[in-house]
UniProtKB/Swiss-Prot annotation:
Family matches, as InterPro entries: ACP (IPR003231), ACP-like_sf (IPR036736), PP-bd_ACP (IPR009081), Ppantetheine_attach_site (IPR006162)
A Pfam cross-reference name: PP-binding
Biochemical pathway: Lipid metabolism; fatty acid biosynthesis
GO BP: lipid A biosynthetic process
One GO CC term on file: membrane
NCBIfam families in alphabetical order: acyl_carrier, PRK00982.1-2, PRK00982.1-4, PRK00982.1-5
Changes after translation: 4'-phosphopantetheine is transferred from CoA to a specific serine of apo-ACP by AcpS. This modification is essential for activity because fatty acids are bound in thioester linkage to the sulfhydryl of the prosthetic group.
Family: Belongs to the acyl carrier protein (ACP) family.
Record bears the keyword Cytoplasm: yes
Official protein name in the record: Acyl carrier protein
Alphabetized UniProt keyword annotations: Cytoplasm, Fatty acid biosynthesis, Fatty acid metabolism, Lipid biosynthesis, Lipid metabolism, Phosphopantetheine, Phosphoprotein
GO molecular function: acyl binding; acyl carrier activity
Modified residues (O-(pantetheine 4'-phosphoryl)serine): S37
Length: 79
């Protein structure tokens, strides 16, 4: 659902301080958006807070791109 994708991108944009245009599905958090491991932890915490879900560490490790995050969160929250 576009609404979830928009919220996810809002969180990424705010947490990483990157322009929205860079938030393509294939954009890697680390290689393309300049995130480090702490940034990833903070992103996951914000996703959990925004969507009121728990993201296990083993799932969080699989969230490498914007598209990964959107697909995972939409599946998790029924989007």
């Amino acid at each position: 659902m576009a609404d979830h994708a928009s919220k996810i991108k809002d969180i990424i944009e705010k947490e990483l301080g990157v322009e929205r245009e860079k938030l393509t599905p294939e954009a890697s958090f680390i290689e393309d958006l300049g995130a480090d491991s702490l940034d990833i932890v903070e992103l996951v915490m914000e996703f959990e807070k925004e969507f009121n879900i728990d993201i296990p560490d083993e799932d969080a490790e699989k969230l490498r791109t914007v598209g990964d995050a959107v697909a995972y969160l939409e599946a998790k929250v029924g989007g």
